Every structure is written in C-alpha cells, then in structure tokens.
Amino acid sequence: MNTVDIQKLIFLKELTFKVENLDIIPKNYLLPMGLIQVCVENALVHGVRHRKLGPWLLNIEFKNEKEFYIIEITDNGIGREKSSKLNKFKSKGTGLKNTFSLLKIINSKFENAIQISFFDDIFDDKEYKGTKAIIKLKHTINYESFEL
C-alpha cells in the first residue's frame, strides 16, 4: 500500500489519481528516497483533502527534457496560500524542509542535480486554485552511488 492508497482509504475515497508516462524514466534510474512522496503527501493532505465538493484530483506526469527528467504533480485542492491560513496554528511539518535540506547537500556535490518548484493558481476557480510541484532530475546523476 502506498501514500495515495492510504489517503484514499482514510480521507479521499473518491480521489481520481492518474499517472502519465511513467515509462519515460528508465527502471534502473534511482531517485532519492521520499522525493516524490513528500510532494504527493502535501498535495493530498494540505490541498485536495480540504475540498468540500468533488472532483478530487491528483495527477503525476513524467516528462523527458534535454538534460532532465521532469515529474509534475498537480492537484485541484485549495492551494498553498489558503492551506497555510488553515494550518496557521498547527505544528509546522518537516517533510519539505527535510527534502530541501537533502537537495542542498546533493546540489552541493552535483550542480543543479535536483530542482523543485511550486506553482499556484493552476485552475481558474476562486475556491480551489490547485498547486503544481515540478521536480527536475538530471539524467546523468546516479543517486545510488552518491555519498553524503
């Protein structure tokens, strides 16, 4: 069972989850552990889960550019700004903070090996603007042989 399955089982029974072009990334290409998971969890827990009405959507699309594999994680949730207001008094999560700390270490060894960007207001909807996370991974980095 994975992160999406658990969220569907507990909170988002009607979630529509789509993965596109997974075969673009070679099966022997190893990603840093948890990299995609943190972005997917944030999309579900802080975005999509706060929708009052469906549809509840999560899309992961894989692309191949010149030097990078691209992973786009798009949700139609409430967006990061509204989510931060809802979670204002709750404890601060460490998922993205830890991920960016890891990226800082990796990128200090290999220039621009991994980049993560977030884009808001993906959809033209006043209440459910959505968020897109874009992860860029250099083709040439072997993360398995990487020593911290």
Question: What is each PLM-predicted segment?
Answer:
Residues 1-119, 125-127, 136:
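Two-component histidine phosphotransfer core
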Residues 124-148:
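C-terminal end segment of the histidine kinase catalytic
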